Amino acid sequence: MNQSTYNSLKSFIWGIANDCLVDVYDVGDYRKIILPMFVIRRFDAVLEPKHEAVIKAKKEFTKAGITELDAALAAVAEQAFVNKSDFTLTDLKSRTNQQQLKKDFIEYLDGFSENVQVIINKFHIRNEIDRLSEQDRLGLLIEKFVDPRINLSNRPVLNEDGSVKIEALDNHTMGTLFEEVIRMFNEETNVTDAGRHFTPRDIVELIADLAFIPVQDKIQSTTYRIYDGACGTGGMLTVGDEHIKKLAREQGKKVSIHLYGQENADETYAIARADMLVKGEGKESDQIRFGSTISDDKFAKEEFDFMLSNPPFGTPWKTDLKAWGIGKKDEISDTRFIINYDDNPEYSLIPDIGDPQMLFLANNISKMKTTTELGSRIIEVHNGSSLFTGKAGSGPSNLRRYIFEQDLCEAIIAIPCLLYTSDAADEARSVD
């Protein structure tokens, strides 16, 4: 997609919020509506060409007594997901009665397969339907998202002569657009934690290069597992997947890549899973898990070949103590953070309660492979405090000692802090 078309699309989506939500929602709440509708319309546009075939197959399968329809109809749709309702968003645009529109829109949402329901539920969009309907904004919102001047499909819109009228929105550009819209909402509302789930594309590319280029000659025709324990919208996993496949092709190798991530924020988790689904990666979408990596590790005892991450920093992790059912960090017994080292069976890697980033690093180290030639590579973004915080014998000091004594650190690279959005404008960052 050329830059002009991309910019027009971004501006149009941003304008939908101002056109549809003014006087109904505060500016800070626009994202609660626009982001899920953006995702839903993307799914809708991808499924649209096969909609009639799906409806026909649904009738045939139902008549034949088949009750588990999701997988069968997804195959008809040629996607990893499906919508079993009788409607598309374009169909709903013609509704003039608000009550009928509301009823049909709910039925439309309910028609999505279970792997999309997980996403819709985390966006909490159903909680907003009554309000949108009562304010006569639901129909306007749908009308804007199906406007023929924009194309959220993965296929181009053609003129009568077959020439391209509006370019397709490919999966990579869709992911970038997601991030751009999120960033715009954050900046508009002065949200200060944008970097919690928005890592600049240049930094993501750098992280992927550091992960794969130094070992490109060792890449074999085999399966590799990539993990991000603070995956946000899934950008690092996506770019990592692209980079290693590109390098493998250049080396004449055929690789199979499996992606794994964990995220504890509803909205970004929903976006990460949505991004996987629209790429046709249904199984990969199931490997994006919800919950706190610190206290609810969804990949316990698993090992990975590459671990790429930009974990949160400077955010207290007291809620994890509560999740563990304990009151003090000294009571933690998780073997990712309390290890047997240097004749000490309770060697602690646990930092102060106010900053979790070292816990994410310890978590990654616990998932390193030790029985393969390549082993594991960890590329993780930290702020400068990870280099010096904690007195001798403290968790951070112990973790640094362990890393260097075990010869696990290949490089520490300083990166310009102003590449980041508002969360890191005054913080030094480094890539380990």
Regions from the PLM with identified roles:
Residues 1-215, 284-293, 414-418:
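Non-catalytic, mostly N-terminal accessory regions of nucleic-acid modification and defense proteins
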Residues 18-21, 163, 188-194, 224-226, ...:
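Glycine- and acidic
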Residues 30, 34-39, 346-419:
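Conserved Class I SAM-dependent methyltransferase catalytic core
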Residues 196-309, 313-327, 383-385, 392-399, ...:
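Conserved S-adenosyl-L-methionine
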Residues 314-356, 379-390:
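Mobile active-site "lid"/loop adjacent to the S-adenosyl-L-methionine
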Residues 420-427:
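Conserved small/polar residues in nucleotide/adenosyl-binding loops
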Residues 428-432:
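N-terminal low-complexity segments that are often proline-rich with Ser/Thr-Pro
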